[in-house]
């Protein structure tokens, strides 16, 4: 599973996931399923934010081409992917600026258009079950919940899905691709079932075979959202090398 994750996800997402696990004292060599889950969640949070802006009229727009004359504000503030201290600093700043109620738990995003924090969930189970678990934990009407599954289902607070259909379809397609690639390599069952995960771990420890070539469909581009996070965790040389025009994504 670890080899699959390193080949399936953008290296910067992998590095952020490694840092998150280290912060909580978790061993990615052992908790390989959690490693995969964290990478998946990070990518979906960044995809949720990508290309969404607020124009001068306060309208939400999707922009995929760089227009230097456009005065745009990022619609979403990304909280997920930051270390806890920085994340809470961002949350406190948002609350002080907007008057939003401070959440009890760290959310994933803040939506400047709807003026609300957002909790993103990615589940291998039924979406309604995971939604209820999230809602019972958060216990706040001020945090919007949006759950995605690997089967294309989704559920959101008051059926308000925030994003346009195309943006959500992009997320669902990516999740379905991850599921298919795991299944092709015999990893999906262990990703879903704890019992199967233990069997897979024993198998992985015995044989450290590299994951066979992934499909060319898997994007290796740098998410615009990741570019925002770069300065907080990348050294200056790597940051300089990757710093490009915000909305110009390299294509293969």
Swiss-Prot record:
List the residues marked with site Important for efficient shutoff activity and nuclear localization: 195, 198-199
Any idea which UniProt keywords this protein has? Decay of host mRNAs by virus, Eukaryotic host gene expression shutoff by virus, Host cytoplasm, Host gene expression shutoff by virus, Host mRNA suppression by virus, Host nucleus, Host-virus interaction
Q: Which GO terms describe its molecular function?
A: RNA binding
Q: In which domain of life is the source organism classified?
A: Viruses
Q: Which residues form the active site?
A: 80, 108
GO BP of this protein:
viral RNA genome replication; viral translational frameshifting
Entry annotated with the keyword DNA damage: no
Compartment(s) where it occurs, according to its Swiss-Prot or TrEMBL record = Host cytoplasm; Host nucleus
Quick check: keyword Ubl conjugation in the entry? no
Site, as annotated: Important for efficient shutoff activity: 28, 65, 202-203, 206
Q: What is its main location?
A: host cell
UniProt lists the family membership as follows:
Belongs to the influenza viruses PA-X family.
- Domain statement: The probable endonuclease active site in the N-terminus and the basic amino acid cluster in the C-terminus are important for the shutoff activity. The C-terminus acts as a nuclear localization signal. The C-terminus is recruited to host protein complexes involved in nuclear Pol II RNA processing.
Q: What does this protein do?
A: Plays a major role in the shutoff of the host protein expression by cleaving mRNAs probably via an endonuclease activity. This host shutoff allows the virus to escape from the host antiviral response. Hijacks host RNA splicing machinery to selectively target host RNAs containing introns for destruction. This may explain the preferential degradation of RNAs that have undergone co- or post-transcriptional processing.
Mind telling me what this protein is named? Protein PA-X
Query: Origin organism of this chain?
Result: Influenza A virus (strain A/Udorn/307/1972 H3N2)
